[in-house]
């Protein structure tokens, strides 16, 4: 009818078609989970995966971490071929391991080896949370223990970057015993005067936080890293108290004397270099045969 010509029409927003969305290839853009800013992935990578807007530290994989701290071309990997089995015949475990191997191109949740920082030799271990959430099973514990023993033999410092959900439940008591094994290896290294630097990244929890991650001569962490043993909700239900908002963050632990420093990723290599420089002498303050 004629009156319909004068009725105010509703305004509609144009929704991009699926074809338009597909014009932007996967991986080109990254959204920061903290400030929600969308940025070019290449810009994020150039900034060591730190958000250019809010400073949020995005997770790094093992190889990105090694590239950010070691001299170029200096890394030599240890025990690359070690892989986990399924000793307890846990249902579905082998399939999950194989899936993570394909997804990450890693054989396990930790990469160990030796390299140099400003020409100073170190043994280093880097955990990768993409593989079984960085959980510690038999192979992870064995690789870390072997790396510590190598540092002992070479009389050089040992550095570890942790990122883990804790002990691996599919391996039961075999995973829990890795807490003791790695701690004993570090004690031997320490008794000989060996330097151990632990750098805790997001997240470092469970059996990893309760063992080797907290045993450093220097305990460092990245900003905002979640560090703790049990989960926040479990603790609140146990103590029946409301915990502070920043509870179990790196900054909270620093304020309460459980960390030596919270170090921005941009400053990590230089901070490690300064510590190593202070402890020159093969990494051993007092070497005891």
From Swiss-Prot:
Q: Which residues bind Zn(2+)?
A: 32, 35, 51, 54
Zn-finger segments (C4-type):
32-54
Q: Which GO terms describe its cellular component?
A: acetyl-CoA carboxylase complex
The name under which this protein is listed is Acetyl-coenzyme A carboxylase carboxyl transferase subunit beta
Matching entries from PANTHER family are given as: ACETYL-COENZYME A CARBOXYLASE CARBOXYL TRANSFERASE SUBUNIT BETA, CHLOROPLASTIC (PTHR42995:SF5)
InterPro entries, alphabetized:
AcCoA_carboxyl_beta (IPR034733), Acetyl_CoA_COase_Trfase_b_su (IPR000438), ClpP/crotonase-like_dom_sf (IPR029045), COA_CT_N (IPR011762), Znf-ACC (IPR041010)
Q: What class of enzyme is it?
A: transferase
Q: Where found?
A: Cytoplasm
**Which residues are in the CoA carboxyltransferase N-terminal domain?**
28-289
Query: Which keywords label this protein?
Result: ATP-binding, Cytoplasm, Fatty acid biosynthesis, Fatty acid metabolism, Lipid biosynthesis, Lipid metabolism, Metal-binding, Nucleotide-binding, Transferase, Zinc, Zinc-finger
One GO BP on record is: fatty acid biosynthetic process
Instruction: Report quaternary structure and partners.
Output: Acetyl-CoA carboxylase is a heterohexamer composed of biotin carboxyl carrier protein (AccB), biotin carboxylase (AccC) and two subunits each of ACCase subunit alpha (AccA) and ACCase subunit beta (AccD).
Which family does the similarity line name?
A: Belongs to the AccD/PCCB family.
Kindly give the SUPFAM superfamilies that the UniProt entry links to this protein: ClpP/crotonase
| UniProt key word Metal-binding | yes
Per the annotation, how and in what number is the cofactor bound?
A: Binds 1 zinc ion per subunit.
Q: Where does it mainly reside?
A: cytoplasm
């Amino acid at each position: 009818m004629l009156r319909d010509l004068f009725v105010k029409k509703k305004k509609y927003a144009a929704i991009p078609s699926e074809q338009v969305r597909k014009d932007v290839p996967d991986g080109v853009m990254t959204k920061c989970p903290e400030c929600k800013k969308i940025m070019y992935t290449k810009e994020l990578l150039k900034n060591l995966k730190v958000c250019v807007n809010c400073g949020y530290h995005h997770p790094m994989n093992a190889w990105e971490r090694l590239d950010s701290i070691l001299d170029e071309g200096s890394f030599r990997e240890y025990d690359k071929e070690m892989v986990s089995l399924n000793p307890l015949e846990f249902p579905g475990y082998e399939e999950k391991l194989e899936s993570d191997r394909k997804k990450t191109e890693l054989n396990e949740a930790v990469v160990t080896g030796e390299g140099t920082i400003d020409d100073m030799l170190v043994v280093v271990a880097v955990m990768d949370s993409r593989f079984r959430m960085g959980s510690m099973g038999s192979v992870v514990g064995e690789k870390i223990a072997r790396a510590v023993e190598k540092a002992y033999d070479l009389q050089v410092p040992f550095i570890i970057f942790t990122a883990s959900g804790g002990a691996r439940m599919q391996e039961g008591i075999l995973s829990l015993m890795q807490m003791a094994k790695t701690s004993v290896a570090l004690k031997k290294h320490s008794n000989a005067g060996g330097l151990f630097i632990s750098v805790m990244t997001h997240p470092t929890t469970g059996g990893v936080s309760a063992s080797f991650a907290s045993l450093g001569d220097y305990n460092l962490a990245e900003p905002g890293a979640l560090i703790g043993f049990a989960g926040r909700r479990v603790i609140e239900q146990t103590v029946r108290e409301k915990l502070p908002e920043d509870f179990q963050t790196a900054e909270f632990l620093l304020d309460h004397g459980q960390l030596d420093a919270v170090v921005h990723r941009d400053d990590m290599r230089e901070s490690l270099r300064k510590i190593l420089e202070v402890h020159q002498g093969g990494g051993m303050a007092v070497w005891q045969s």
